[in-house]
Each structure stands twice: as C-alpha cells, then as structure tokens.
C-alpha cells in the first residue's frame, strides 16, 4: 500500500507497517508522486499494506527536519526519500533534516545519495517542461479550464510571457487546480523520459518496493 496526504505521526499508521517514507513539500507534490507510484505498478490502498510506502506532505521545506526526525524515531529501520525545490535554500534544509533524522551525508555528497531529489524550480515546472506547453494545454482543455487560461494569458501582467511561465503561474493560482493537474500531468508522462528528479525517485521507489 502507498498512503498519501498523512502525517508520518498519523495514529492510523499500522505499527511497523511503513518501510519507506516519501517526503515532499506540498499536497500537489504528494498527488504527483502518488500518480507516479500507480504508474510504476505499486499497489495503492487505504487500509492494507503491500509495498509499505507512505507519501507525506511536510507542509513546506522548513518542516522537513521535524517530520523526518519524528518518523525516524518511530521507524528507525525505514528508508527515507523525497523531492524538494531548490528555491529558498532547499538543499540546506534537506541536509539539516537528514542530520535530524540521523542520516548523515558527507559535505561533498548531494542529498541524492540519501534519496532526496531536487526540482530546479518546483515539480510543476519540471512536469510542464517534460510534457511541453501543448500537452499541458490539452489537459486544461479536458478539464474545461482552457478558456480561463486564455483569459489569464490576456491579462496585462502575463501578456508576452513565455507560455511555459504562464502555465506555471496559472496552475498555481488555485490549490485545488494545482493538485488535480499535478496528477493528470504525471499520468501523461512517458516513463522512459521522466524529469530528472522524478526518474531518480521512481528508481528509488521501485528498489524499495521490490517490484521489477
């Protein structure tokens, strides 16, 4: 089973049942990783565990230390992995969080060596670049959101910006849209051409689950 959108300290977590924690910054990231896991063939569910993987949103990079430390105390033998944004000192926060969880990495090593993969801007940016603007617009059209996007593009503050940037800003204007579209964009990815951080995490999850 893969669980999403729960705290690592959730009272509903089966004792000793989680072997891998995937920690991300926000709920849209969790939705994207959950969609990736489904595409990788990892069994999903709410009440039973198969692959013993939990996907959790920390509610921001500054909460990584608290979440990882608490999870490591409750599950000392579990694996830790995740995604983070490079903005706002992302790598520094991840290194501090790994230290709090007693997972030390050498100064010359990147967080990737501990299973944490960096998105250059954020995950939505990575997904838009991987799919291309036309594919993302098709997703918006299927959701009935394309007219809203066209109006957004016509606003003076957005007019003339690259379409990629317009799409990124539009997805972020509503939290529900951002979460919904994150899942839909992942469902359209070519698994052989995943964005670099997603490819690294996918490889980590497959190894952790024993699938493949």
Predicted feature residues:
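Acidic, glycine-rich catalytic loops of TOPRIM or P-loop NTPase phosphate-binding modules used
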Residues: 2-86
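Domain-length accessory/inserted modules outside core catalytic folds
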Residues: 69-80, 141, 201-208
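Short acidic, S/G/P-rich loop/turn micro-motifs used as interaction or catalytic elements
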Residues: 87-91
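Charged phosphate-binding loop/patch that engages nucleotide di/tri-phosphates or the phosphate backbone
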Residues: 164-212
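Activity-critical C-terminal alpha-helical subdomain
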Residues: 92-165
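Exposed alpha-helical structural elements
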Residues: 32, 63, 122, 126, ...
